[in-house]
Amino acid sequence: DFFVWTSVPSCPYKKIFYNWETNKAEKCVFCYPRLENGLPQICAETCVGRMRYVGVVFYDMDKVEAMAATKNEQDIYENTLDLILDPHDPEVIKAARAEGISEAWIKAAQKSPVYKLVKEWGVALPLHPEYRTLPMVWYVPPLSPILQRVTSDVYLPDAHEMRVPVQYLANLFTAGNTEILARTLQRVLDMREYMRRRETGDGPIDHNVELTEDQMYGMYKLLALSKYNDRFVIPSDVKVSREGRLEMQHNRGFACPTGGCQ
């Protein structure tokens, strides 16, 4: 895995512990000291491709056990989406406030790029959902080069005409469900075709698409033109005001007895 062999060894926040078999092991801890202070992981912030997004997602804890107990592993992805709650829903906002979730976290969830990619547009998928671990690291499957036999007469190919087989990607992201994987790829292809027609003035797309024009343009802006604050929407975990936190850091250092400077 490229991430394991490059990002983790060079990461200053990784966890190193002794392993009796390999003599050493390095684990990603998701840069929790940075996240708790409203900062993204160092690998996400320094990513040259600017293709990593970090945000808040609300989900229903009461449904987790039922999701994990799903008999057909190809249904786990759809059941996982059912766990994710709409942060704009008044009932969800009311329940979040009742649970003591701050307004900063609610606003962060409403602006979350992760919610848009995962639930609103449905173009991000979990890695190996059949393990039933409820992963919250999601991936937009890649659009690989098209096959040689269709390059001469096709500008944008169908999802099944990519060089990387749909079944291979489905085994990674949807527990082998090729229908969901092909649908996800087609949404990204539709966005690309929409933007091409928008720039060239060729008119609307001549086939049925699942997303609206506003959704496809919003996807284009997030994936291609997003700024730092659009890609990383992370509320601070500190319970005190910024002024109060700085005052405690000045008087006591970062290890505050009250826990306010964590």
Task: Report each predicted region and the residues it spans.
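Iron-sulfur cluster-binding cysteine motifs and their immediate structural context
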Residues: 1-23, 30, 36-60
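Catalytic cores of enzyme domains
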Residues: 24-30, 120, 127
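Long, compositionally biased charged/polar accessory segments in the mid-to-C-terminal portions
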Residues: 49-262
